Amino acid sequence: MKAETPSFEAHQFVRVRRGDAVRRLIQRDKTPLAVLFMAAVVGTLAGLVGVAFEKSVNWVQNQRIGALAQVADHWYLVWPLAFILSALLAMVGYFLVRRFAPEAGGSGIPEIEGALEELRPVRWWRVLPVKFVGGMGTLGAGMVLGREGPMVQLGGNIGRMVLDVFRMRSPEARHTLLATGAASGLSAAFNAPLAGILFIIEEMRPQFRYNLISIKAVFTGVIMSSIVFRIFNGEAAIIEVGKLSNAPVNTLWLYLVLGMLFGCFGPLFNFLVLRTQDLFQRIHGGNIKKWVLIGGLIGGLCGLLGLMQPSAVGGGFNLIPIAAAGNFSVGLLLFIFIARVVTTLICFSSGAPGGIFAPMLALGTLLGTAFGMAAIPLFPAYHLDAGTFAIAGMGALLAASVRAPLTGIVLVLEMTDNYQLILPMIITCLGATLLAQFLGGKPLYSTILQRTLAKQEAEQAAKAQQAPRENT
């Protein structure tokens, strides 16, 4: 029996349904051009602010060092001047934060994570100037802080500023541009576009709403910020360590051991950061005068330490290539490592506007290089290069402390231009992350955010209890 042929109307119905399905698919994948345009604006502004922030900090540092050089031959002048200049610069940063924008203190990354969850406010009109000028003061004073945290917060606030200027009310656009600004800020700080993207996806994965619109916007913003950075600073790697040798397969187990070493140190480092924060809170008790004076004392001591041991202060970018080249002995590397652990804890935990990314990269380099130099005489047949362990160590502490191994791997490879070391980097960061997790360590930024939210809830509860008393 002959099968019945479908009618013309049936063919038309099927064709229409297919067309509707295709249109729905296209519509679902269609990113509003307005969002991409604003993402490009956010990325461009974040790149410009990043370049301006870097050059401003360098200018302040050069002015301070230049003033000290003028009296370098007179010890009775150079020591007091080193303390006074750094103390005054640091006090500017502490005062601005405490007086005008408390949320601008510290790294700023937990604030962006909280804002992505609508748990923390984004008051860009006061955070932008306070974080910029305050960061110039604390970083210019030579304190052990990095510019990446401020740049992430500045970028996120730029995203919210652009949103308000264009009067976008969509919750999705608000979230997307905030994430775009944060990624663009990190990219502009390190000249690491892929790391900026991965940082949002990996470190802020609980808060970031991953979809076709948001990821395209993040890509667009990061591209623009990277282009702006390279226009002003060139395309060379931000940390010049040269091309290092490959890691032979029979030496890879050493990188796992190194990763386990960082896996033990990472949770301890996080614990010390939190305890030091509590210590400073007990000392100043929220009093602005005590807080600023303590900040000035810390800044002044960093200025003095810079005269005695310059490698113990500053963000650490200048120290990394020197240490990775094997110019220090194992004993000196460990001494500088311990000194920088102490100064990093004091400077970051005091609430100064500045990040901890760069100091952690320097700490990882020091310990990684020391491990490599100690292993060379123990395994002469391996023909080891201490520099490869320095590169692996850079990302390992970041992986163990922040719990973002993929970001740590890509960030270090982009900054040093040593992509051939990706395998030992993966092994080291994986070992560090797994052991840190096994030991019960918590991600640093998430823990700081939880403490901030708990403090916020306590303050709100106190105000709620105080209101009825005032009315009676």
From Swiss-Prot:
Q: Which UniProt keywords apply?
A: Antiport, Cell inner membrane, Cell membrane, Chloride, Ion transport, Membrane, Transmembrane, Transmembrane helix, Transport
The compartments listed are: Cell inner membrane
Q: Which residues lie on this side of the membrane: Periplasmic?
A: 70-76, 233-252, 310-329, 377-386
Q: List where the protein spans the membrane.
A: 33-69, 77-100, 124-141, 148-166, 215-232, 253-281, 288-309, 330-349, 355-376, 422-438
**Classification via Pfam families:** Voltage_CLC (PF00654)
Q: Site positions for Mediates proton transfer from the protein to the inner aqueous phase, renumbered to this chain? A: E203
Q: What is its main location?
A: membrane
Chain positions recorded as chloride binding sites: S107, I356, F357, Y445
Instruction: Give the InterPro entries listed for this entry.
Output: Cl-channel_ClcA, Cl-channel_core, ClC
Q: Where is this site: Mediates proton transfer from the outer aqueous phase to the interior of the protein?
A: E148
Q: Which GO terms describe its cellular component?
A: plasma membrane
Motif Selectivity filter part_3: where? 355-359
Q: Which reaction does it catalyse?
A: 2 chloride(in) + H(+)(out) = 2 chloride(out) + H(+)(in)
The organism sits in which domain of life? Bacteria
**Residue ranges of the motif Selectivity filter part_1:** 106-110
Q: Which segments are annotated intramembrane?
A: 109-116, 177-189, 193-201, 387-401, 402-404, 405-416, 417-421
What's the stated role of this polypeptide? Answer: Proton-coupled chloride transporter. Functions as antiport system and exchanges two chloride ions for 1 proton. Probably acts as an electrical shunt for an outwardly-directed proton pump that is linked to amino acid decarboxylation, as part of the extreme acid resistance (XAR) response.
The record's annotation in PANTHER family points to: CHLORIDE CHANNEL PROTEIN
Q: Per the similarity annotation, which family is this? A: Belongs to the chloride channel (TC 2.A.49) family. ClcA subfamily.
Query: What is its quaternary makeup?
Result: Homodimer.
What's the name of the protein? H(+)/Cl(-) exchange transporter ClcA
Q: What is the lineage of its organism?
A: Bacteria, Pseudomonadati, Pseudomonadota, Gammaproteobacteria, Enterobacterales
Tell me the name of the encoding gene. clcA
